[in-house]
Amino acid sequence: MSSVDQKAISTIRLLAVDAVAAANSGHPGAPLGLAPAAHAVFKKMRFNPKDTKWINRDRFVLSNGHACALLYSMLVLYGYDLTVEDLKKFRQLGSKTPGHPENTDVPGAEVTTGPLGQGICNGVGIALAQAQFAATYNKPDFPISDSYTYVFLGDGCLMEGVSSEASSLAGHLQLGNLIAFWDDNKISIDGSTEVAFTEDVIARYKSYGWHIVEVSDADTDITAIAAAIDEAKKVTNKPTLVRLTTTIGFGSLAQGTHGVHGAPLKADDIKQLKTKWGFNPEESFAVPAEVTASYNEHVAENQKIQQQWNELFAAYKQKYPELGAELQRRLDGKLPENWDKALPVYTPADAAVATRKLSEIVLSKIIPEVPEIIGGSADLTPSNLTKAKGTVDFQPAATGLGDYSGRYIRYGVREHAMGAIMNGIAAFGANYKNYGGTFLNFVSYAAGAVRLSALSEFPITWVATHDSIGLGEDGPTHQPIETLAHFRATPNISVWRPADGNETSAAYKSAIESTHTPHILALTRQNLPQLEGSSIEKASKGGYTLVQQDKADIIIVATGSEVSLAVDALKVLEGQGIKAGVVSLPDQLTFDKQSEEYKLSVLPDGVPILSVEVMSTFGWSKYSHQQFGLNRFGASGKAPEIFKLFEFTPEGVAERAAKTVAFYKGKDVVSPLRSAF
């Protein structure tokens, strides 16, 4: 190790320690242990701090996000739009150095990590996207895409089940462009890993199909770490796990103990570190000039590499004008012109069809038009109907099951990993529009990943079928009740529950055009009629008046399968002398973004509003005065019988509508949309 290397590693360590000390909050242990690995990995990486969206950059993911003082120190030293002053504001309100990495706030952070295990799954998604992208656009003598994904992960990540799901799939997919580094420091918050984590990780990853490299002294041996990277790159048909034997809190008086994990070092400890490593013990946030020069040199080399890539891409566009134009369009974040003309349009004369089938029809129409759409299912393809006819599977060619240019991903029964991998695909860039299918109830298995989709502003899409008691015989274990309320309550998630074909097309239009908001499409197993008065344009507002009634006594607002039920209830109400209108509200988030004038035209003052949805009523008081829903678990049986059991029939809806009319008769009724703030 050269003296500059040693000085650089010490600088990384001390910047992290100083940042945590300044905040009086954070995690110094992992940065002290992983600094040599970070130094070695970044020296091998191809990136340009001045162009963080260059598509052929290598990606770095910090799965153990609590070690973010390490990442921030690297970003500062390499000249990203992050400075020592930002480090001094570590974990402070409004800073660019939050308590865990956030891709929306931290220049150079590829993904948002913190919940353990998510980052390694994101890394799998990034590597998958890179492989698909390369197989689609690379040509002989034109390696447009040949980047690597590097992931740091800790024992906590390995304990989380989601990492096992994703690592298993990565091994099957033979993602040789993925290199993960396990910080094997044998410490957890509760103490030694001997208390809860004693499995043979290496044997497990070998069984997944990963290549293994071990570095026995990752505290100091950067030559071995660099050699591990070189070895990993030679193994092109397996992802690699590099076991880094490290000491948590290396150099600290508390090194090797759980006490150094998540608390600032004491002042005397910091001083002895600085003295030991040749720094002024009274100075904080020091960056020696020779370290800056060394890192600037690597950046300059990388900028030359990017310039060569730019020239390569220019030549590519001349030799392959159609592909080049398509690729440029994707890099510009634009969709194909008039792609939405492919969306199916329906009339009431068309047959009743389940919205999951309508979803399949949409996918079959738009996938040929939009090459950036890729997707799959968590082993429910025949039920979710997520595979468009003729779509090739994304598989290693050696399996004989597909190839890397394939656009259909077999996720297996791995819902949580699927969600986190989708986040990684979105993080890769190139305008990927990716979707994953499962039953709506099992999107809950992936709640951690879904929440990070929303926080990260990744526009991924869940094709969530079997959306209610309408799935029938599988019973309450599979019938979602609270699921929609949960995800509607999560900020920045568009939860669509379309009622017919036009609304399903509108849902996909919203999802494909989204740039910052994930979507969940809740779709039926049972057939639904095509509605009179629906249209893609109307549904695209998130809510609209389906049945207009002058001087209505009541408005019934519903979603999905209950919209046609509400329409059927009108005849019953008419027989009772009650005039009712019907509003379809397929997506609350989109509706909420409309003008106040428009929203009040749909859900106006002066008329009581009843919501009808065969789910939890939680959250519906924002849009209705009275709520008819299902605040209990469902039942196993034939769907029509279950609907009848819970009185979700035209008569059941009409009964509750009549009671609502009677309750509000003679009273001043203010729209539930109105509020003081």
Curated annotation (Swiss-Prot):
Positions contributing to thiamine diphosphate binding: H66, G114, P115, L116, G156, N185, H261, E415, F442
UniProt keyword list: Calcium, Magnesium, Metal-binding, Thiamine pyrophosphate, Transferase
Binding site for Mg(2+): D155, N185, I187
Transmembrane portions of the chain: none
UniProt name for this protein: Transketolase
Active-site annotation: E415 (proton donor)
Enzyme class name: transferase
Family listed: Belongs to the transketolase family.
Catalysis: reaction(s): D-sedoheptulose 7-phosphate + D-glyceraldehyde 3-phosphate = aldehydo-D-ribose 5-phosphate + D-xylulose 5-phosphate
Record-listed E.C. numbers: 2.2.1.1
Site note Important for catalytic activity, residues: H27, H261
Chain residues that bind substrate: H27, H261, R356, S383, H466, D474, R525
Gene Ontology CC entries for this record: cytosol; nucleus
Tree of life domain: Eukaryota
UniProt organism field: Scheffersomyces stipitis (strain ATCC 58785 / CBS 6054 / NBRC 10063 / NRRL Y-11545)
Underlying gene: TKT
Cofactor note: Binds 1 Mg(2+) ion per subunit. Can also utilize other divalent metal cations, such as Ca(2+), Mn(2+) and Co(2+). Binds 1 thiamine pyrophosphate per subunit.
GO function term, MF aspect, one: metal ion binding
Matching Pfam families: Transket_pyr, Transketolase_C_1, Transketolase_N
Needed co-factor(s): Mg(2+); Ca(2+); Mn(2+); Co(2+)
One Gene Ontology term from the biological process aspect of the record: pentose-phosphate shunt
PANTHER family: TRANSKETOLASE, TRANSKETOLASE 1-RELATED
Function: Catalyzes the transfer of a two-carbon ketol group from a ketose donor to an aldose acceptor, via a covalent intermediate with the cofactor thiamine pyrophosphate.
Complex and partners: Homodimer.
